[in-house]
Amino acid sequence: MKNTYTSSNIKILKGLDAVKKRPGMYIGNTDDGTGLHHMVFEVVDNSIDEALAGFCKNIIVTIHDDNSISIQDDGRGIPTDIHDEEGISAAEVIMTVLHAGGKFDNTSYKVSGGLHGVGVSVVNALSKKLELFIYRDKKIYYQIYKNGYPKNTLSIIGYTKITGTKIRFWPNLEIFTNVTQFNWEILSKRLRELSFLNSNVSIYLDDAKKHINENFYQQGGLKEFIIYLNKNKKPIHSKIFYFSSKKNNVEVEIAMQWNKGFQENIYCYTNNIPQQDGGTHLSGFRSALTRTMNNYLDKEGYIKKNKINIIGDDTREGLTAIISIKINDPKFSSQTKNKLVSSEVKSALESLVNEFLMEFLLENPQESKNIVTKIIESSRVRNAARRAREMTRKKGTLDLIGLPGKLSDCQERDPALSEIYLVEGDSAGGSAKQARNRKNQAILPLKGKILNVEKARYEKMLSSQEVTTLITALGCGIGKNEYNPEKLRYHRIIIMTDADVDGSHIRTLLLTFFYRYMPEIIQRGYLYIAQPPLYKVTKNNKTRYIKDKNTMENYKLSTALENTILESNTDKEIKIKCNYTLKKIISEYKIIQTIFFKIKDNFPLNILNEMLYHPKLNNLNDEVYVNNWINNFVIQLQKKSSSTRNYSAHITFNSKDKIFEPLIKIQKNAEVKEYKFDITFINSYEYQKIYSLGKKLQEMIQKNIHIKKNNKTYSIKNFQKNFELLIQNSFKNVLIQRYKGLGEMNPEQLWKTTMNPETRRMLKITLHNIDTTNKLFNTLMGDSVEPRKLFIELYALKASNIDI
C-alpha cells in the first residue's frame, strides 16, 4: 500500500474552523460539562476585566428556559467603530477573530483574565446561535450570529442611557454532548469566587428554569473569603492575616488563617484565574512562610526551649490561605493555565510575605502564640508519626514487599487490568473470595468500621490495623514523602458494603479516607462503589434481582397494574386496560405519600388523607364558607375514626391578613390537640399537590369508577387502603427477599449480581467541586457538632431513602 505524505496533506483551518474541529484545545472537555461552563466563564471574565479596569460594577448571568445563557455588564461596551485592518466593526472582529481583543495592547487592560486567552470568539464558534447587544454612546447596537457567522451587520435598534455589553448564546449540542445543561452549583461556585476576588463588584446569578437566584457581592474581599472557607472549622486566632502590596510590577494580595483541623487549603489565583497546580506564587509563599515562622520561633526562643525542628508541613497544618496576584503578561505551563511559571513572581512573594507576616506576628502576640502552639504541636505529632512508621516497618506491617494475610490477591500483575474489592466483614469476604475471578479480582475483607480520618491525627490513623492493612494492600504508600499513586496495584478499587445503615457508614468512612489521603485515586477514576441488589424476587419459578427501593416500588406498581382495568357502573365506555390514567394517578399518589411523611408533624395522617376527598379551601374572607367547609371535614373525619377520639370544628380570625382560618381540635381522654389550616399551609406547594390529586379522585368517584383486577373490584373512595390491598393481592404468589447483608447471598448469587463484569452495576466516584466537597466532609465527618446539627435540621425532611 502506497503511503504518500505531501503538501496536499497539510490542511489550513481558517477563521474559527480550527475551534470547531478541535474544541477541546480551546475550551476544555466537551463531554463532561467542563467546556460548556468555561464558555460562560470566558464571557464573564471579559466583564471582570472591565471591572479591573474600573469601568464595571454589575454583572448579571441568566440561565434561560431554552437552555441559553446571557451575561450582561455595565462596563464601557464593546467598541462599535470600524476596525482599520479588517474593515468591519470592532465588535465583529472580537466575535469572529481568534486572539482579537483589548487585552493584547497593554493599554486598554493592564491585567486581564480569560481562561484560555481566546475569549468570546470561541464561545461564538461553539454556539448554535449568539446574540450581541452593545449599550454605548447612548445607542443600543445588535447583531446575531449563527454557528459563528454573522447573519446581519451591527445595527442600531434603539437608544439608552446605560452602557455595557450583553451576550446571549445557545451552545451547539452537536459539539457539547452528555452534559448539555448549565449547572447552578458549578456556576455559583465560580461566580462566588470572583465576587470575593473582586470586592464591590456585584454578580447576580438567575436561573429562570428553577426559579432560583443569588447575588454575589462581597465588600470584605479575601478576608471574607477566608471566613467563608473556614465556616465549619474552628479558627485558632480571630484576626485574619491580610496584606495587599506591589513589588516588581507584581500586585500581591494574601489572606490566611489557621484552624484546628489538619488539612492544608491554599488557593492560588493569577488575574482571577485559579491555578489548581499552584506555581511560582505558591512556591514563593510556602518558602517565605517556612522561613519567616522559623525566624520568629528562633528569635522568641521556642526552638531552643522545645528542642524541635520546624519544616514547611508543620507551618501549613490547618492553614487556609488565598493567594491572589495580578501581573501583566503572566506565563503558564499550559493553555489551561493550571500552573504559573512566571519567575519574577516567586521573589516578589517571598519578600512581601516575609515583611508583612513578621510584622503581623510581632504586633499580635496572642494570635502569634496560638499559631506557634499549633505549629509546635504539628512538629511533635509529625515526629511521633515518623517513629510509629519506623516501628511498624520493623514489625513488617507497612512493608510493601509482604502483603497482608487477609488479602486474597489476584494473579494479574498489570494494575490496569486488576481490581480489588473492599468487602464489609469476614462473612461476605468469604463469599466474595469464592465468587471472584481469581485472574484479576482481589478481595480484602475489612472488619467493622474503619477509623474516621477526618477526626483523627496522622499517627493515630497509622495505628489503626484496618487502615494500615488497606494501605499495604493498595501498595501506593501514604504520607507526603511516601505516597506515590503510580505504584497503585489496582486501577479499580471497588467498595462493597451491605445495603443497610452500617454499610452506608463504612462506605462513607472509606470515601473520607480516600478523599483526604489518596485524592488522585478519585481524580483518576479508579474508585467505585458496588451496587449489590437489595431484593430478590421469585415469581412463577423465575428469579430476578432488584437494585434498590425505588426500582422495587416501580416493579410493584407495574406488576399490580398487569391485567388491571378501570370500570364505571354508570358509564360502560370507561374501560381501559393497563391504562395511563391509573398509572399517572398512582404516581401522583406516591408523591403525595412523600409529602405526607414530610408534614406529618403538622397534621395527623388521617387528616392529611381526608384532605384528598374535600374541595379546595379558598375564599378565606367568607366566614360562613370557611365554617361550612371545616364542619363537613370534621363530620367525615369522625365517621372514619375510632370512638376514642372526639373531633370538633372551629375557626379563628387572622387579624393580620383579615381572613378566617379553620381549626380542628382532637380530644382523647383529657388530652386536646389543635391543628390549624393557616394561610401559609393553604398557599403551600404541599397543599396544592394534595388538592390536585384529590380533585382527580373526586371526579372518578362522581363517575362511579372503580379498579378491577381478576374479578376483584377496588373502590376509589378509600384510595390508600384499596391501592395497598391491590398490591398485596398482586403479590400473593410472589416471594420477596430483602438482603440486609452481603453474607446472605451465596457465592454464585454474589458473582452474578455484583462481581461479574458482564452483568454488574457500579457507581464511579468523581470529583467536581473541591470547595463543596471539602465543606461536606468537614461538616458531616468533622469533630464540630453544631454544623452537623444544622445540616441535619436543614436537610432531614428532604431525605427519602431512610432505613428504619
UniProtKB/Swiss-Prot annotation:
Keyword Isomerase tagged: yes
Listed GO MF terms: ATP binding; DNA binding; DNA topoisomerase type II (double strand cut, ATP-hydrolyzing) activity; metal ion binding
Record key words, sorted: ATP-binding, Cytoplasm, DNA-binding, Isomerase, Magnesium, Metal-binding, Nucleotide-binding, Topoisomerase
Any Pfam family the entry gives: DNA_gyraseB
One cellular component term from this protein's GO annotations in UniProt: cytoplasm
Binding locations of Mg(2+) 2: 498, 500
CDD domains referenced in this protein's UniProt entry, alphabetically: HATPase_GyrB-like, TopoII_Trans_DNA_gyrase, TOPRIM_TopoIIA_GyrB
Free-text remark on how the cofactor is bound: Binds two Mg(2+) per subunit. The magnesium ions form salt bridges with both the protein and the DNA. Can also accept other divalent metal cations, such as Mn(2+) or Ca(2+).
Feature type site, description Interaction with DNA: 449, 452
Compartments (UniProt record): Cytoplasm
Residues noted as binding Mg(2+) 1 in the record, renumbered to the chain: 424, 498
Catalytic activity: ATP-dependent breakage, passage and rejoining of double-stranded DNA
GO biological process, alphabetically ordered: DNA topological change; DNA-templated DNA replication
Cofactor or coenzyme needed: Mg(2+); Mn(2+); Ca(2+)
EC number, UniProt record: 5.6.2.2
Task performed by this protein: A type II topoisomerase that negatively supercoils closed circular double-stranded (ds) DNA in an ATP-dependent manner to modulate DNA topology and maintain chromosomes in an underwound state. Negative supercoiling favors strand separation, and DNA replication, transcription, recombination and repair, all of which involve strand separation. Also able to catalyze the interconversion of other topological isomers of dsDNA rings, including catenanes and knotted rings. Type II topoisomerases break and join 2 DNA strands simultaneously in an ATP-dependent manner.
Subunit structure: Heterotetramer, composed of two GyrA and two GyrB chains. In the heterotetramer, GyrA contains the active site tyrosine that forms a transient covalent intermediate with DNA, while GyrB binds cofactors and catalyzes ATP hydrolysis.
Family classification: Belongs to the type II topoisomerase GyrB family.
Misc remark: Few gyrases are as efficient as E.coli at forming negative supercoils. Not all organisms have 2 type II topoisomerases; in organisms with a single type II topoisomerase this enzyme also has to decatenate newly replicated chromosomes.
Designated name of the protein: DNA gyrase subunit B
